[in-house]
Amino acid sequence: MGVPFPIAGRQIALAIDEEDHAHDGAEMERRRGRPHACLWVFDVGDPAHIQPLSMFEVSELESPWSRAAPGRFGAHQFHERMDDDTLVYCTWFAGGLRIVDVADPLAPQEVGHYIPEPAPGQAGPQTNDVDVDKRGVIYLVDRGPGLNILEFKRPK
């Protein structure tokens, strides 16, 4: 996603490096220690020389359901519109919603998160999609429990 305004003097774009998921506990165990999908920040000021600036990752330790098979953990999707703010709203499967500030594109910082409880009989949440309306209301979709409607107050 291209950001429609410069941030810290740079024209940036964001991308999510989505990974395959483990189908069972044994496969999840083999993947232990590997990096998960993350949020990438690129300088796209010169399209002929796109440069990676940074990546934002979430540790498995940040979610009690990160290793709940047959689930997924890692970046999945982000809200695909940035109007005049530097906040990026990302879904992280079992890591829930992550709100990341890219005001410093070299060092993105998490400023908020929400992890829904899994649905009954589900090993962990699988947060799948996020949308944010013009009022700042967050609509978070999980494959199990369904829809969460949230508000976020940016820290001062």
Residue ranges and their predicted role:
Residues 1-156:
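Feature marking well-ordered beta-strand scaffolds used for ligand recognition
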